[in-house]
């Protein structure tokens, strides 16, 4: 029993030596990019949209970013993803936002938002 405890302590010490704890740095990003997803066909928000918007609100309240870029077009139906999500967020908190309303997929979300982000670090919210 004592030998097992000693071996366990030794293994923990070895692990700590080779894999030390690195605290997460709380970084502030100039921009956060909120990736759009389709609303329901009747224009109501999908659960994915609501979850993503709530994540954006929470991260803003924690001070992790300054301006929110919401990216997404009307891919599945007539409702523009970025506009639907922006309406939801604006009813809950005032966040500086940029709407990118032409992206039709994730690749285009990044490509078309690049003009705003430039070379800045960005927080991706999905």
Segments and roles (model prediction):
Residues 1-24:
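N-terminal type II signal-anchor transmembrane helix
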